[in-house]
From Swiss-Prot:
GO biological process, one term: signal peptide processing
Gene source species: Blastomyces gilchristii (strain SLH14081)
Gene for this chain: SEC11
Spans within the Cytoplasmic topological domain: 1-14
InterPro entries: LexA/Signal_pep-like_sf, Pept_S26A_signal_pept_1_Ser-AS, Peptidase_S26, Peptidase_S26B
Record-given protein name: Signal peptidase complex catalytic subunit SEC11
Amino acid sequence: MLSSLSPYMANPRQTFTQVLNFALVLSTAFMLWKGLSVYTNSASPIVVVLSGSMEPAFQRGDLLFLWNRSPRVDVGEIVVYNVRGKDIPIVHRVMRTFPDVPGKDKTKKGGKQDVEASPSSLESQKLLTKGDNNLSDDTELYARGQDYLDRKEDIVGSVRGYIPAVGYVTIMLSEHPWLKSVLLGFMGLMVILQRE
């Protein structure tokens, strides 16, 4: 087995070049992802639909493109949110919006006298969501004690476009962990066997 690797060990410069090329591909992909994250103002600018709760609008495996630069979300808009304490993105439609203007919290304590809260602190928005294919709203999905989603804290982004079925590869990799090993092994083998 080691004798089959001897041509690669005989020329360390070529081996080093292949390793650098592989590192370049990985770092370029990472930079593109981070650049897209900054441009869209979303930690996850691209997500995959994991369930059928949004059918017929989106099918399981659809790849969604998100935008999170709008200060407000409108009723009927499709958003992606994360439940607090869980790391699974949920894609659902906004059914109702509520301005977050607390009744008794309009002033903040500031020493001896009360100080009016700034307008930016009152501009938060509460949202109630529901999957198109679900019978009830998402209050059962939210974190314990949470009745609404907070626009600034919970929303990953609003859906601006999609490509059907492309994301099904990631679902297959999640459901069958052995496929990840096969894919990584294949990629590693291609890097080793590639000659320039």
